[in-house]
Amino acid sequence: MSKITKIIAREIIDSRGNPTVESEVHLEGGFVGLASSPSGASTGSLEALELRDENKDRFMGKGVEKAVSLINEKISIALKNKNARNQSDIDHIMIDLDGTINKSKLGANAILSVSLAVAKAAAASKRMPLYAHIAEINETPGVFSMPLPMINIINGGKHANNNIDIQEFMIQPISAKTVKESIRIGCEIFHALGELLKEKGMSTTVGDEGGYAPNLKSNEEALNIIQDAIQKTKYKLGQDIRLAIDCAASELYNKNEKKYNLKGENISFSSKEFTHYLEKLSQKYPIVSIEDGQDESDWEGFLYQTHVLGNKIQLVGDDLFVTNKNILKKGIKKGIANSILIKLNQIGTLTETLEAIKTAKQANYGVIISHRSGETEDASIADLSVGTSSGQIKTGSMSRSDRTSKYNQLIRIEENLGTKYAPFHGLREIKSAF
């Protein structure tokens, strides 16, 4: 009942109006899994490769017809009659068929869409939710927890057309007792921020991830406005709400000058200076998490930052680790960062993603499951966060259905499992001393 009978791939549109790959996996017994691949804007250089057509006559060269053809003509043949419940076997067949380190032959976007669709079809054949099937693949059957959200309310950097250099300013509702309550708190603060921006005559347009994207004088002004917005609600910054930022510092780094340039403020920092700039921000505001606070290749800078901030702040490696267990192991050995951001399409299969999560947990690193700036309505990351008890999720703001689809799935899962079987640990999930 779980043998793959056919795979159909197609080109669909993501949240930025760019093409991406969707795969439909059919099993004996009529079970079907449907999944699509997301796409990033600020990407790590060691991420698995996203295959694009490069045909300027279609979608400005961003079409994915090649990837679709490779699924329909090669991957589908290689996987026909294979058991969809053997996720590792399925993924390794595709990895071997590709034969490259970075999945450049078949494309991570092609491989991932099939990998996730296989998992969904297998879950359907077992008549269980995706999160429960993922827990079984992860060898943690029946073990679940609900993640604390990182809710992006101001977008900057490559995620918005504005002058803010830090890419994401996020809130974490630490006083919430359930994920549903944390989402409600996030919504209330999001709307309070929107009203405040209107009062100040600022733009309330949103960026790629649904957060507001106003032009501001500095990164500190963004933090001040968030602080003011929270004061308009019944919540207290520091007590109910903590802050998180994603610097995406690789996008700020000039390799020739070895400087981090904040163009919006017209200031530059050396590696150590940038760490101390972030340290001052975290002393002035209740920032509990800093993502990619150095360039991905500046491991000495990351090591220094970890020595300075690692005992107080959650230091998250995104471009640094690219969901790659081998790179993560090197970072763990060197004592770099204390948490990892998990993005399925950085590595390209569900199996390798689960391996990265296991590696992080074994080293007591924090785990944050993440979306990409180019998303679809696929809500698999919600199930992934629950099925691996990852503890935190980062999936954008409280606008744009490509973001809210994940929050809504978390609400459904929590309702289905109840707090007894899927506890919400809140602040305890953050690798921070606060």
Curated annotation (Swiss-Prot):
Binds a second Mg(2+) ion via substrate during catalysis. Keywords: Cytoplasm, Glycolysis, Lyase, Magnesium, Metal-binding, Secreted. Pathway: Carbohydrate degradation; glycolysis; pyruvate from D-glyceraldehyde 3-phosphate: step 4/5. One of its GO terms (molecular function) is phosphopyruvate hydratase activity. The keyword Translocase does not apply. Mg(2+) binds at residues 246, 291, 318. Its cofactor is Mg(2+). InterPro entries: Enolase, Enolase-like_C_sf, Enolase-like_N, Enolase_C, Enolase_CS, Enolase_N. (2R)-2-phosphoglycerate binds at residues 167, 343, 372-373, 394. It catalyses: (2R)-2-phosphoglycerate = phosphoenolpyruvate + H2O. It is found in: Cytoplasm; Secreted; Cell surface. GO terms for biological process: glycolytic process. GO terms for cellular component: cell surface; extracellular region; phosphopyruvate hydratase complex. Its main location: cytoplasm. It is an enzyme of class 4 (lyase). The active site is at 209 (proton donor), 343 (proton acceptor). CDD domains: enolase. Its EC number is 4.2.1.11. SMART domains: Enolase_C, Enolase_N. Component of the RNA degradosome, a multiprotein complex involved in RNA processing and mRNA degradation. HAMAP family: Enolase. Catalyzes the reversible conversion of 2-phosphoglycerate (2-PG) into phosphoenolpyruvate (PEP). It is essential for the degradation of carbohydrates via glycolysis. Belongs to the enolase family. This is Enolase.
